[in-house]
Amino acid sequence: MKLWKVLLPLLVLGCSLYGLFLLVSGATLLQGLLCLWLFAEMIVNWNGMSYLTAIKDYRGILCSFLAAIALSFGLGYLLVFILGAPVLEGMLFSITMGYGLMMVWDVVLLYRYFPQSDDSPWTFLRWVDRFLPLAFTGLCTNLGLFSHLVLYWSGPIGVQVKGLFYGAPYYDVPALIAFLSILITSINFVVSVEVNFYPKYRDYYSLFNDGGVVGDIVTAEEEMLAVLNRELRFTALKQLFCTAGVISLAGTLLNLLPLGFNDLMHGYFRTLCVGYGLYAVGNTVLLILLYFTDYLGAVLAAAVFAASTTAFTLLSLLFNTAFYGFGFLAGAALFYLVALFRLDAFTANLPYRVLGQQPIVAETKEHLFTRLGIFLEKQDAKTARQTIRRENRSHE
């Protein structure tokens, strides 16, 4: 019940704004309803996966993804190829049902791991004020990751699909396939970097909390940073080899698929493979900055990524379409360098960062979101009292 109280504001606000867009977008009633349904499911799924990754239930997430993929493909094939349903509506309905299955699966897992609690469902708003830089880090990272796609929709290669729906198929398709080349880094961060680095990280910080001697702290720091440097170097090398392999082999494989790849799309693909590879390694460094609670450095790197990618993409619109994608490549390279230099500067004097930069007196931040949480808690308490009074009157 409390899960839905948290999701309710997101669903109401998000669906209201997206619903207004759909009303003027030119989509049919059925298409609009399916898009709105899918949008609402994605809100629940995104929040659910955030909690499930926090408790590291990767098997549950994998099973929900596999079940959703199987249902989407199976139902899509049945509706479109066997029953002859319209392709757009049939595939959109299939995807919606697949994500619906994922939503139900994730909610069941959430209720299994997080049973009913007496705590207020609005407590998380207090943490928003404390960790607001994380929200801006995520926002800037996503802006840098997707702004180049949106900007090219308005360029010479952009097409109007229908109403307010735009795209750039010659660029979007290579971008989607190139993005898959960074899966090795995403997986490597979980199974290698976190597995090998986190124990050293935990031992180092436990010495500060448990009264470790200076010699042990220095030794633990050297071991931790050595493991970190090794894992980051291996991550970069794995992504380099993966990117080189994909660029070398994908040209032949992509020509075998009915995707309509031409020389221009192959050029976009190669450029974006390098760009996404740099982004993947830079994002790994960004996550390590968050490990060390360097929220300022993380926001700085993410902001540079968002601003540079957008600016370089706008600049590339002035040149020939063959140069599209280099704006994202330049922004990703700058993001990687800024994040790496920040991590090097931060870890160069780590004991001072851990001890000297902490506030002497504990600070309690009560800003907008905290006050909003207190207000909602009071409203819940007021509603609960009114409910109890009504129940008492009915019993009398």
Stretches found by the model and what they are:
Residues 200-212, 350-389:
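Short, highly charged, low-complexity non-transmembrane loops/tails of multi-pass membrane proteins
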Residues 1-19, 207-246:
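Membrane-water interface segments that mark the loop-to-transmembrane alpha-helix transition
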Residues 64-110, 322-345:
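Hydrophobic alpha-helical transmembrane segments
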Residues 94-194:
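Transmembrane helical elements of multi-pass membrane transporters/channels
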Residues 1, 184-215:
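Helix-loop junctions and terminal segments of transmembrane helices
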Residues 12, 63-77, 125-133, 303-310, ...:
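Small-residue-rich segments of transmembrane alpha-helices in multi-pass membrane proteins
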Residues 4-48, 240-248, 258-285:
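Alpha-helical transmembrane segments of multi-pass membrane proteins
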Residues 34-54, 91-104, 250, 267-292, ...:
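Short runs within selected transmembrane alpha-helices of multi-pass transporters and secretion channels
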